[in-house]
């Protein structure tokens, strides 16, 4: 969060004609998820929450900043309410804020996989192709609707930056030229 605050301070030039783009990533959450490390995932989530607070504080004061929070892909781990007493102590978490709500961490894929060479790998969770959560605040956040295909985050950001025909307040068809062939993509 401190690095994000400093980056915003360095990039923010009230006299500049154009704004700035800043991407912040929680780099270790993916590693923690692959390792089935629930404590690591929770710690990374807490850290990115602090980063988001810094970005939102700036956006609220600035009034012309779009903050988008999303993931580059989903993962198989979920932290969900648990009414089952059969969950092992290792996966049982207690929330200190409400005095003991029980949560459990579940991994939605097999605890093994096969690598590109055909070798059996263990202890690594998978990336599913599911939609990812997305949240936004500020101008253009009307294009951020709660969930989207992970590849569509590009269109949200490009529209906000007004790149390649993106429009403020709506998403148009995109055309990509490959050689002499034009392909239209729905955004």
Residue ranges and their predicted role:
Residues 1-185:
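A post-motif C-terminal structural segment
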């Amino acid at each position: 969060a401190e690095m994000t605050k400093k980056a915003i301070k360095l990039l923010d030039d009230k006299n500049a004609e154009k704004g700035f783009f800043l991407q912040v990533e929680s780099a270790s959450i993916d590693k923690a998820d692959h390792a089935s490390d629930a404590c690591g995932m929770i710690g990374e989530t807490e850290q990115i929450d602090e980063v988001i607070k810094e970005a939102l504080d700036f956006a609220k004061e600035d009034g012309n900043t779009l903050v988008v929070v999303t993931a580059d892909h989903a993962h198989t781990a979920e932290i969900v309410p648990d009414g089952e007493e059969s969950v092992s102590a290792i996966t049982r978490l207690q929330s200190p804020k409400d005095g003991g709500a029980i949560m459990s961490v579940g991994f939605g894929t097999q605890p093994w996989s096969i690598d590109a060479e055909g070798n059996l790998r263990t202890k690594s969770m998978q990336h599913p192709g599911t939609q990812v959560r997305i949240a936004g605040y500020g101008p253009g956040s009307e294009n951020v609707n709660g969930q989207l295909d992970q590849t569509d985050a590009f269109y949200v950001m490009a529209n906000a930056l007004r790149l390649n025909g993106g429009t403020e307040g709506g998403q148009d068809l995109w055309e990509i030229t490959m050689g002499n062939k034009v392909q239209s993509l729905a955004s």
